[in-house]
């Protein structure tokens, strides 16, 4: 029962997290391209200096919503994965390849958590601050253009870090193929000679 419960939590959390990260990673370029092709005009952002940039702002807002939802999924699934990884050594077979793979999975999880934390705490605030500065100073090209450059660079870094998290989670999936139930050995009956 313990093995099944731990594995259920592990696989649900890992697959949900990996799928969510992959969805955001694949959908962000599609959102940007589709909105850019339709060339919208945002009525609340009035500036003659933002010719052609309304689509970037709208697409950025859509992707921001996706990334904020992804953060919630990362926190919940990351917590469940941590609990499952702590419980796994007590319920899985750690002989031969199992022990090494458990260590690799834990290392990949910690690396993915560190990258996601860095993105959340250090990169994402730069994305939002530079976007706000760009919109607030749209009529001042000397301020708006460097803010747009910072926004684009921070957003690219954000997507690259999201891709790194996806790669680390894929590594966890690949190193999970060795997870097995512990073998139960029944003692062999002793033979008595007649």
Please place each PLM-identified region on the residue numbering.
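Individual transmembrane alpha-helices with interfacial aromatic-anchor signatures
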Residues: 66, 146-166
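Alpha-helical transmembrane segments and their membrane-interface junctions
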Residues: 77, 84, 162-179
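Functional transmembrane-helix hotspots
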Residues: 120-136
């Amino acid at each position: 029962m313990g093995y099944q419960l731990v594995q259920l939590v592990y696989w649900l959390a890992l697959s949900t997290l990996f799928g969510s990260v992959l969805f955001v990673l694949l959908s962000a370029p599609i959102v940007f391209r589709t909105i850019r092709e339709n060339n919208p005009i945002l009525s609340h952002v009035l500036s003659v200096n933002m010719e052609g940039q309304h689509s970037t702002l709208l697409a950025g807002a859509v992707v921001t919503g996706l990334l904020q939802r992804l953060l919630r999924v990362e926190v919940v699934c990351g917590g469940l994965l941590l609990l499952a990884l702590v419980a796994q050594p007590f319920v899985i077979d750690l002989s031969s390849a199992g022990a090494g793979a458990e260590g690799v999975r834990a290392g990949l999880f910690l690396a993915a958590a560190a990258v996601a934390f860095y993105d959340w705490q250090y990169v994402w605030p730069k994305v939002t601050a530079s976007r706000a500065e760009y919109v607030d100073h749209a009529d001042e090209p000397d301020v708006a253009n460097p803010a747009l450059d910072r926004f684009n660079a921070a957003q690219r870094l954000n997507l690259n870090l999201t891709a790194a998290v996806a790669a680390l989670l894929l590594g966890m999936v690949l190193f999970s193929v060795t997870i097995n139930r512990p073998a139960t050995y029944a003692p062999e009956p002793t033979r008595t000679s007649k």
